[in-house]
């Protein structure tokens, strides 16, 4: 799931923020 989010959104822009969004979408407890 994380790979899909990475491909969908440019990590170079804001990793952090993208990581948070990815975790939330995955459903992770973050």
Swiss-Prot record:
Keyword Hydrolase: no
Gene Ontology MF: a single term: rRNA binding
GO cellular component: ribonucleoprotein complex; ribosome
UniProt entry keywords in alphabetical sequence: Ribonucleoprotein, Ribosomal protein, RNA-binding, rRNA-binding
Family: Belongs to the bacterial ribosomal protein bL25 family.
Quaternary context: Part of the 50S ribosomal subunit; part of the 5S rRNA/L5/L18/L25 subcomplex. Contacts the 5S rRNA. Binds to the 5S rRNA independently of L5 and L18.
Protein task: This is one of the proteins that binds to the 5S RNA in the ribosome where it forms part of the central protuberance.
Name of the featured protein: Large ribosomal subunit protein bL25
Organism: Anabaena variabilis
